[in-house]
């Protein structure tokens, strides 16, 4: 097939990387990009364009932003584009069956895991939070179920010990772009052969809840480290510092270092400053905080926070917990 007509659907930077790659492919044309409506963001709550909308604008691709596909007019608009393929990556909206039936060939989805593992909204974050050593990318044909469709291509990718969700989004976006180009070539040449998922091996990567952003210091230090990595850069791993006679300080903790060091205090105790880091007692072991961000401030070294807030105080300095006191 020559001149494949492609409609792209996606929202964040992960998807924008894939859009740019597909738009540069010489086997077809991206005739439209669908992305979520502009959302209020930042302190001023100004409407913010998605990364896909910005990329599409740079590429001269028409943009559509329906709130959903419940209205007949939105479905008819998509059908009028006569797509051969839908390419979907982190769109964030559920697509009803009548939308999935529109393309001449397939609705293809880029999913940031080795399906059937980590179906759902947060596969990359969950893999890092769970301490997995390997994750990957899957190209699948979309169906009405959530990430349940048959698979076309997969690629495994190693999660390095220093990786965060942020670094893995970047790595997997590039792998996803390369894999999608391979999938489009297979479709255009009539070589697309899909393999069903084994539902018995599936699990669900639900969206990160607000309560999960708060660090539970009673967990073992390595587990805490994985959770912090998986929440970095967004939404961030958070805690409150309580100090006798002082107002609580809300902190966002950056990835530091889990230490195999028995803590002589209760979990959450901010024990002392040592070797450039603040040591926190955990349920098992000790966590060394090397960088953090107090509410309303920029991210700083733990040593700078110590010099500005804790120096001169007797150790232990206070207690970290998920609740403001």
Language-model segments: residues:
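A generic structural signal for well-ordered alpha-helical segments
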Residues: 55-56, 132, 232
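N-terminal Rossmann-like dinucleotide-binding module
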Residues: 1-43
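Donor/substrate-binding cores of folate-linked one-carbon enzymes
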Residues: 36, 85-211
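Short beta->alpha connector loops
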Residues: 12-14, 67-70, 91-93, 259
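Internal anion-binding site segments
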Residues: 199-325
